[in-house]
Amino acid sequence: MLDLNNVSYSDDGPRDFELIPDGTVVRAFIKLSGGDHELPEFGGGTYFKSSQSGAKWMPIELTIVGGPYDKRKVWQNIFVDGAKTDQNGFSIAKRIGLETIKKMVDSHFALDMKDDSPEAAQKRGSINGVHMLNGMQICFKIGIEKGSNGYADKNKIKTILTPGSQEFIAGSPAAVAPAATPTPQAAPAPSAPATTATAGVTPTWAR
């Protein structure tokens, strides 16, 4: 029989963390969480789809490596499709999503965004699906997303950094995160406006 009266609380420090300050630069491992929708043009990987719009996204978990925020986590969504299109009829969400994914790959491989050398092309070309982001280590600047609908403020990716930025923190592209296989899990459909491809809520261009 369960007896909680004999269970002592361990003194592991506070359970609630203060938000990481806006503008903090960190490195973190990526862990993907798949959904139940496939997008062949993005290669391997599965996505969630909003029941209220054309938005599709993949949740990511970022575990910070090193520094005062070691092992802290940041959760966001990579939006990869939406109903709104540009003047050429191309999905705005898909374009921004592809740009975000490319920045993550460039950050992992320590490639300058303007590097179009054969070596850079070979490294980018080795990524044949979004699923390959799983376990990559990237550098990014922390931001703070204002909470809405009763949710508290939370940290988010403000900017993904590459060697072209003076704030870029170099790491080892050979570093491998602890083995983890993405598994589908429930995620609330985002509902409020945002401005980045990795925001926690549905951007207007992804609806």
For each of these PLM feature ranges, what is it?
Residues 1-207:
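Short beta-rich binding modules
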